[in-house]
Amino acid sequence: MVACAALLTVDVGVARAADPSPAVVSIPAGPFIAGSDGAERDYAYRIDAAAYGSPVTREQKWYDGERTRGTAETGAYAITVTLITNHQYAAFVTATGHPAPDVDRATWESYGLIHPYARTRRYAWAGGRPPRGREAHPVVLVSQADALAYAAWLTRLTARTWRLPDELEWEKAARGTDGRFFPWGNEFDRHRLNSHDAGPFDTTPVGRYRSGASPFGLHDAAGQVFEWTITADGDGRAIVKGGSWDDKGCGVCRPAARHSRPVGLKHILIGFRLVRE
């Protein structure tokens, strides 16, 4: 952890009011420990069972498909310190006329999710503006294509290349190089993240859980909302990472945890952050 923390570099972009560049941290090229082993997965299943009162995630084998623990390599890149916020996304919507985050009832109900449609209304935009009081919350109800469109706009505006991270880039930034179970260490601590264990059962302003930062300085890499990656997982699906405010346990909030969602899904539990090349 000390070695990773020493490498932390924060780049807030050009210091001018009109610059839309999100703050980033620099991640050096090189190896890191990715994936999980049996001991980590067993720990995840045990903390889930304690939270849910049953071994449901073990029975459904939630974590059995994780990458086998081992060394992986990435190049150097920078990644946004926080998830992209409603305020940041609003500049894109205003400038381009891109559809604002929302989902209609029929589409939502076609997803077959457990959350009722009424719950989506607190996150839906009106008149091209984010919900009042949620400007600093992560933007949600965005598909992977929406995230890519925001990245393309930011690229044009800043003359720097912005994109979604791939799964390994995201995982390295979220856990550091030493293979820890969570961004902060190997023990789950419900006070270090926004999850259903101790959170408000809702999104919060980004960066609130500072004690849950990763060794590289990422905030909300565990909990808050899942995050789109560019890594495909079969036809029309992409890997999402990070866990959410709706999860408890929170084995799914580990950086090694992974599952995929349809790329067109607009979910109240999925947002994104970006890599800058």
Predicted regions and their residues:
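Bacterial N-terminal signal peptides
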Residues: 1-10
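Boundary at the C-terminal end of the N-terminal hydrophobic targeting segment
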Residues: 15-17
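Functional-site microenvironments in short loops/helix caps that host divalent-cation chemistry
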Residues: 26-27, 33, 39-52, 56-60, ...
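Short, structured beta-strand segments at or near domain termini in extracellular proteins/domains
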Residues: 268-277
